[in-house]
Swiss-Prot record:
Domain of life: Eukaryota
Positions annotated to bind substrate: D379
Species name: Rattus norvegicus (Rat)
Modified sites of kind 4-carboxyglutamate: E47, E48, E55, E57, E60, E61, E66, E67, E70, E76
Name of the protein this chain belongs to: Coagulation factor VII
One GO CC annotation: serine-type peptidase complex
Residues in Peptidase S1 domain copies: 194-433
Protein modification: The vitamin K-dependent, enzymatic carboxylation of some glutamate residues allows the modified protein to bind calcium.
Function recorded in the entry: Initiates the extrinsic pathway of blood coagulation. Serine protease that circulates in the blood in a zymogen form. Factor VII is converted to factor VIIa by factor Xa, factor XIIa, factor IXa, or thrombin by minor proteolysis. In the presence of tissue factor and calcium ions, factor VIIa then converts factor X to factor Xa by limited proteolysis. Factor VIIa also converts factor IX to factor IXa in the presence of tissue factor and calcium.
Reaction(s) catalysed by this chain's protein: Selective cleavage of Arg-|-Ile bond in factor X to form factor Xa
Domain EGF-like: 87-123, 128-169
Any Pfam family the entry gives: Trypsin
Amino acid sequence: MVPQTHGLLLLYFLLQLQGPLGAVVFITQEEAHGVLHRQRRANSLLEELWSSSLERECNEERCSFEEAREIFKSPERTKQFWTIYSDGDQCASNPCQNGGTCQDHLKSYVCFCPLDFEGRNCEKNKNEQLICANENGDCDQYCRDHVGTKRTCSCHEDYVLQPDEVSCKPKVEYPCGRIPVVEKRNFSRPQGRIVGGYVCPKGECPWQAVLKFNEALLCGAVLLDTRWIVTAAHCFDKFGKLVNITVVLGEHDFSEKEGTEQVRLVEQVIMPNKYTRGRTDHDIALVRLHRPVTFTDYVVPLCLPERAFSENTLASIRFSRVSGWGQLLDRGATALELMVIEVPRLMTQDCLEHAKHSANTPRITENMFCAGYMDGTKDACKGDSGGPHATHYHGTWYLTGVVSWGEGCAAIGHIGVYTRVSQYIDWLVKYMDSKLRVGISRVSLL
C-alpha cells in the first residue's frame, strides 16, 4: 500500500543522509518540509510524483466531491459518479423489467420503459391494462374490448378517428356536442343568476329546444338531428292531437326576437307503449319536426352516445348540466332567458333510500336516476321538463338524461329525477330511422 511505500522511502532517504559518526545528521527546515509536508490531495511522497487519478483518489482511499470534480472536469459526469460512489449503484440489481433502461439516482432509480410497458419497474403491460373499464381505455369517445388483443377506439358518426387511434376530430362543420360560439372565442362567459343557476350565455346551450302550445311555454326538449328532438312523454299528457304545438330552436330570450330562432311544427310524437299517462316510468318521447332545421352557431345537436359508453363512462361523471326556462323559484315566475345549472348525480342506492323515506314519492325504477342538491339550492323546475341532462367528456357533450319529475322546485330534502337515456338509446336510434304515421304513436320497447 502507499503508506508502506512512504515509510520505506523515508527510511532510505534518511540513511542516505548519514555519514561518518561526526557528520551532521540534521537537515534544514525547508528540506524536511519537502519530505514530511502533506499536500492538499497527496497521501504520500510517492503520490506527489503521480498525476491525479480515480484509482488513487477515490478507489484506494476516500475522496471528497471536490476531488472527484477535479478528476472528471464535467458537472454531469461528476454528479453521475458521485451518486454511485456515495450511495451505491441502485441499478446494480437490474430492477427494470421487460427491457427497461435503469438510471441511478440518490437512494433511488428511474426505469425508462419500452413502449408497451409502464410501472415503477416496467412490470405492467399496457395492453393488459388498456381495457375499457379502465379510464375508458384512454379513448376520446367509444371503446370496445377484444379477447386476446387490446381494446379499440371509435367515434360518433360526426367525428373521425385520428392516426393515434384514440382521438376523435370533427368531420362536419357542426358536429354534435360541440359549442361553436365558445370554440370561436376560446372561453365561456357565465352571467346573471332554473333555481340557483345562471343565464346560459347566448349560443352556449345550442341543443336546447322549447315546446310551445299557443305560443306559451310547454316543455323543454333537446335536438338530436335535423328533424328529431327528445323530450318527456308527460309533456303530451293533455293532448290527443298535435295542434298548435310548435318547437323553437336557437331561442334564448323570450322577451325579444334575436334572429337566431328557427320555428318548426310537430309532425309526429313517438313514446314507449309502457308509458302510462300521469305516471313517471318510461317518461321519454321522440318528436319529429315537419321539416329539418339548419345547423348554425346557435343550433347544434347534442350527441346521443352509445349505450355502453353512457353506462360505463358518462354515468360515473358526477356533475352534468341541466338547462331550461322553468320557474326561477317554487311557484314563481318562469325565466325569460335560458338558464343552466350544474347538478351532481347521486348514487342509485342513495336515490332509492331517499325515495323510500319520502311520502308520496313515485317509485324509482331502473329507467331513472337522481341528481341535485339535498339542501334545495339548485334544481330543475316546472317548465324545464323534457330538457336535457348533458354530460361533458373529453371536449364533447352527450345526452344522458331528460328532466322528468321532482317534488317541488329545489325543495329542501328533495331531488330531481331524470329519465335514464341509456335505457332507450337503441329504441331512439331504431325509430329515428322509421316512418310511422303522423300524430302520436305508442310503440314497443326493444
